[in-house]
Design a protein with these regions (language model features):
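Basic, polyanion-interacting recognition surfaces, primarily
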Residues: 2-141
Length: 141
């Protein structure tokens, strides 16, 4: 019962941001972060590299888990899959760049490279971009 109370407290903080719990492939809790601290997640073989902000610096956390599994766990969050190797946090997307048929996402965090969007995710990402741009100040480039 106490554990349940802690989980409920951990899901939201004062600013209505929520905490995201990252579990490894064995479903063991490894890392918990406020949603607005996560910039993007990149897959690397059987690992995911979580890029997040800590003391105004972007740092990495290596998690043994698949991007597919993480995308299922995070489906109701602003963190969306945009490529077979990437998930992005729409809380940090500054712009969506369309060059011919290629789409890429640019972040509002210094020193972070833009992330490509696979053609298979184009519609979903455009939909998410419109949805989140109403909440934040994004622009189409």
């Amino acid at each position: 019962e106490r554990e349940k109370e802690f989980e409920e407290m951990a899901t939201k903080d004062k600013d209505e941001k929520f905490l995201i719990q990252f579990k490894d492939e064995r479903n063991e809790l490894r890392f918990t972060l406020a949603s607005d601290k996560i910039v993007y997640i990149e897959s690397s073989d059987n690992y995911c590299i979580i890029k997040y902000i800590n003391n105004n610096e972007v740092v990495d956390f290596l998690l043994r888990n698949s991007l597919k599994r993480l995308s299922e766990e995070l489906k109701d969050t602003p963190i969306q899959r945009c490529h077979r190797s990437y998930m992005v946090n729409f809380e940090h997307i500054a712009s969506l760049r369309k060059d011919n048929s290629e789409i890429s996402l640019e972040f509002d965090v210094k020193g972070i490279k833009e992330v490509p969007v696979s053609k298979s995710y184009n519609d979903k990402i455009m939909e998410s971009f419109v949805k989140f741009s109403k909440q934040n100040s994004f622009h189409l480039v």
